[in-house]
Regions:
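Extracytoplasmic "Venus flytrap"/periplasmic binding protein-like
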Residues: 80-154, 189-190, 287-295
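C-terminal capping/gating helix-and-loop segments adjacent to ligand/active sites or protein-protein/ligand interfaces
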Residues: 396-463
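Short, well-ordered beta-strand elements
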Residues: 53-66, 84-90, 116
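Extracytoplasmic ligand-binding clamshell segments of periplasmic binding protein
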Residues: 97-99, 227, 237-323
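Hinge/lid segment of periplasmic solute-binding proteins
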Residues: 119-179, 208, 317-319, 401
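Extracytoplasmic/periplasmic substrate-recognition and gating elements
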Residues: 107, 310-381, 436
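Helix-loop-helix "hinge/cap" segment bordering the ligand-binding cleft or interdomain interface
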Residues: 147-149, 159-231, 243-276, 338-343, ...
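Short, low-complexity disordered leader/linker segments with a strong preference
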Residues: 1-58, 450, 457-468
Length: 468
């Protein structure tokens, strides 16, 4: 999935037929993608039944990274009788390129229209519940039932985000419930232990305890987080309601509190005042910032795909525990075009692939490979948190970066504690405006009231959304 890597390096326009190349692991981001259009051979499987093979079903798959397209290779390897080929289009979200292209393709319809398409957390509600939701098939119409969801014990927040009026339209394969990821050595020096069960009670529940811990860490010369962006995601996704109520801009009290908590971090020197996705933020993962930083908030993907390449000498000096408040961050959902139901063969093929990715809890299901890092035969890939608690409960989440801790012991409850009922289809744009104004306030460039007023005005000017 694309995990909110907004600094993607290139626009990927790969209106291509995926070649059978297989990913090295559960890869993230835009690895292996070209910055210019390229075309290859079909990713397909021949039917072994009958003397005259039936014409293959072509599935048009749209995505914004090569992650889901790479899954088709594993699917075909584990389904040798699948009479299907995948025609893949990958367009990066850089500069907002993916959504307009997807919207146009869905509206145009026809044989080249997307049959399966991906949407990430930043804009999935547009396709599952919002303006573009009418294009999406109900999972039930594909034979993917609520009982299957229950049997797989899919994280409820993922179901809520993918549902409209009680009808499931999208599911993810990954679960992105968040934890607090902290330095063991700093925990021992400050709190006398690095035990996750003890640390969770030092930093929470609630922000009051978190800031009590920040004061203790500061006395030892440590910051509790790298920047205010580190607390934004748990604040944003633990709010009671989203940015819109009855079509008008609403500032949930928990989100408004971000102004005060951000200022408290800055005024007390509790962080290094970095911005996420910058070199200074990465430096704090390796312990090379201006003061050692205790921790970061994030899902398993932050550990696997971001910190793993940045921790350097601090590798193994990390652990995960429950955060002060439940939240999720990121994720990718799969949707099917409702028009696939018009062709029984295509409907069956699309349903089988989506089931394998999102609901199959067997040893040959995508989520089992994903959780255990076994996507590529004979190689240990990256272990990751998945949507099915059934799969997580029987998988081994021990990783070296966490000193051998089984991260699934923390991420299973983290996924259960996340809420998917506070999102809107405008979150990506509104969040940028909000965080800009919070930084203006904490930097002393404007008053709290002015920051809120300017936030409301920019939302009106840029999105034509009035305030309550």
């Amino acid at each position: 999935m694309k995990r909110l890597f907004t600094g993607a390096t290139a626009i990927i326009l790969l209106a291509s037929v995926l070649s059978a190349c297989g990913g090295n692991s559960n890869s993230s981001g835009n690895a292996g993608a070209s910055s210019s259009p390229s075309t290859g051979g079909s990713s397909s499987a021949e039917s072994s039944a009958g003397n005259e093979p039936k014409e293959k079903v072509t599935i048009n798959l749209w995505a914004f990274t090569d992650e889901i397209p790479n899954m088709t290779t594993k699917y075909l390897a584990t389904h040798p009788d699948a009479n299907v080929e995948f025609k893949t289009t990958i367009i990066a979200t850089t500069d907002g390129a993916y959504q307009p292209a997807l919207d146009q393709a869905l509206a145009a319809g026809g044989k080249d229209a997307p049959d399966i398409y991906a949407a990430e957390a930043a804009f999935v509600l547009k396709y599952s519940q919002g303006d573009a939701s009418d294009y999406a098939a109900n999972y039930a119409d594909l034979g993917l039932t609520d009982d299957m969801v229950k049997e797989a014990d899919i994280a409820q927040y993922s179901v809520d985000i993918g549902s409209k009026d009680g009808q499931l339209k999208a599911l993810g394969y990954q679960a992105t419930g968040g934890a607090f990821i902290y330095r063991r050595s700093l925990a021992k020096d400050t709190f006398g232990t690095d035990d996750p069960a003890t640390i969770k009670n030092e930093i929470g529940p609630g922000w009051d305890k978190f800031f009590d811990a920040a004061a203790k860490l500061k006395a030892k010369g440590y910051g509790i987080v790298s920047g205010d962006g580190d607390i934004w995601h748990p604040i944003e996704n633990s709010s009671d309601v989203g940015w819109l109520v009855d079509g008008k801009l609403h500032i949930d009290p928990k989100r408004e509190q971000f102004l005060d908590l951000s200022k408290k971090l800055k005024d007390n020197g509790f962080h290094n005042d970095t911005q996420d996705w910058t070199e200074a933020w990465y430096a704090d993962m390796s312990g090379s910032g201006k003061q050692p930083i205790f921790g970061f908030f994030g899902p398993a993907w932050l550990i696997n795909y971001v910190m793993n390449g940045q921790v350097k000498d601090t590798n193994g000096d990390w652990a995960v525990t429950e955060p002060p408040t439940g939240f999720f961050w990121g994720g990718t959902w799969l949707l099917a075009n409702k028009d696939v139901a018009k062709d029984e063969a295509k409907k069956a093929a699309v349903a089988d692939f989506i089931h394998w990715v999102t609901l199959d809890t067997s040893e040959t299901g995508l989520q089992n490979y994903w959780a255990n890092g076994t996507m590529k035969d004979g190689e240990q890939g990256t272990k990751d948190s998945v949507a099915s608690a059934v799969v997580m409960s029987k998988s081994n989440g021990q990783i070296d970066l966490l000193g051998g801790q089984n991260m699934f012991d923390v991420f299973v409850p983290a996924n259960a504690n996340a809420s998917g009922k506070n999102l809107t289809q405008y979150d990506e744009s509104i969040n940028i405006i909000w965080r800009d104004q919070v930084r203006e306030y904490t930097s002393g460039n404007k008053s709290r009231d002015q920051a809120i007023a300017d936030f409301k005005q920019r939302v009106k000017d840029e999105l034509n959304i009035d305030s309550e």
